[in-house]
Amino acid sequence: MKENYNYPLDLSWSTTEMTEVLSFFNQVEKFYESKVEKELFLESYAAFKKVVPSKMQEKQLGRDFEQSSGYSLYRALKEVEASGKRFVSADKA
C-alpha cells in the first residue's frame, strides 16, 4: 500500500456521486487492509456502477486507483463475488 495517494475522481460528478465512488474505493481499501462484509461491498459496488455505468470508465478508474494506491478494484471485486463467506479479505492466511 502506498501512503498519501489521490483518488481518481471526475470533477463533473455531484457531491453525492463523488461520495458513492469514494465509498466504493474505501471498501476496496478495507478489503486489502482488513476485511469487508460481502453484502456491503456489493451494495457499494452497485452504487458505484450507477455513477460509473461504462465498463471503459470503470477500467480506467480502476487502473488509476491501482497506480495510485496499489489496490486492484478488479481483483477485490472478483474475490468478493466468488467468496461464499460473509466476510472477505485479501489476506488468505
Curated annotation (Swiss-Prot):
Organism in which the protein naturally occurs: Lactococcus lactis subsp. cremoris (strain MG1363)
Family: Belongs to the UPF0223 family.
Domain of life according to the entry: Bacteria
This protein's name: UPF0223 protein llmg_0515
InterPro entries: BH2638-like_sf (IPR023324), UPF0223 (IPR007920)
Record-linked Pfam families: UPF0223 (PF05256)
SUPFAM superfamilies hit by this protein: BH2638-like (SSF158504)
